[in-house]
Amino acid sequence: HGDPKFRRDVIGRIYENTKAIEAFDIATEAGLSTTCNFIIGYPYETLENCWKSVELASQLNCSDINAFIYTPYHGTPMRDMCVDAGFISDDLIVEMINNDQGSFLNMPRPYMNKKEIYDMYNNFGKYFRENTVQRDRIGEGKLRQLIA
């Protein structure tokens, strides 16, 4: 995820974006092929949070970048978080993953709705490429001002 605060508070991963960028640069310089997978539609995710993932994706030196819609698997703390927040019912059983189904979560504002999650998933590659071209054209600092 591209938002360090969201990544720390909701996902439980603590690292700065600069470290991720640096790690992918090192791997690429070493001749490794890399894949970066972004998950969209986490519980409590806003569009603003999600756009920070697009921004991060445009800065990563990856061979391949993919996006997937968050799935609330049984037995995970994040699924329990979704049930406790009322984003899904406790009896929901995810038998088969199909991103084209969209999100299982029903989140109120200010969080992403099902349409926003699906649209971001469906267009992530396009947004990432546009962001990369724009960054290269106008410079990274200016892009950060436009996205903020």
Segment roles from a protein language model:
Residues R144-A148:
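C-terminal non-catalytic accessory extensions
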Residues H1-L143:
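A structural motif corresponding to the C-terminal lobe/cap of the Radical SAM core domain
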